[in-house]
């Protein structure tokens, strides 16, 4: 029986950035850290200038002739690029409607599970459809279902705003929550006064 082929399970090496000594081109068009054109100079001279500035020589356009490098703080540049990428990803997030289903008679543990699910959806930037399902004659308990949904809205008020108040939809009662954009301002009556220190009796 022929031996089974062996697969290389090692993680692929990350592509290293073309900076400093990793740049292999002998001649480079160099832009200084302030945007000044230093012209076409040798790789060694470019590295020397970057070293004098206590900065990095970074290859920014490999396809140009000769390749273009810029003298910069690569660590700061990388941080700003990653920050921009995260912001772009956040803006490109398509808002979805996630649904949390429950019965009007729900125990505390299951209720907390639904709260956790809704919290996770809201943090991801999605809207939440809270649905109370009625079966058979349970439809007569719409008041209890409405109370449950209002309780959920109250428990999530720091993270969510009510987009649509509880209402009947067929044999269900629904409520829509959307991620809160502005911080919740507590009423003065909800702000607890600091506890007074207890007096000791000698």
Curated annotation (Swiss-Prot):
UniProt-listed Pfam families: IF3_C (PF00707), IF3_N (PF05198)
An annotated GO BP: ribosome disassembly
Gene Ontology, cellular component aspect: cytosol; membrane
Transmembrane segments: none
GO molecular function, one term: ribosome binding
Database matches in SUPFAM superfamilies: Translation initiation factor IF3, C-terminal domain, Translation initiation factor IF3, N-terminal domain
Keyword field contains Protein biosynthesis: yes
Alphabetic keyword roster: Cytoplasm, Initiation factor, Protein biosynthesis
InterPro entries: T_IF-3_C_sf, T_IF-3_N_sf, Translation_initiation_fac3_CS, Translation_initiation_fac_3, Translation_initiation_fac_3_C, Translation_initiation_fac_3_N
Cell compartments where the protein resides: Cytoplasm
NCBIfam families: infC
Function: IF-3 binds to the 30S ribosomal subunit and shifts the equilibrium between 70S ribosomes and their 50S and 30S subunits in favor of the free subunits, thus enhancing the availability of 30S subunits on which protein synthesis initiation begins.
Family: Belongs to the IF-3 family.
Subunit structure: Monomer.
Protein name, UniProt field: Translation initiation factor IF-3
Top-level taxonomy: Bacteria, Bacillati, Cyanobacteriota, Cyanophyceae, Synechococcales
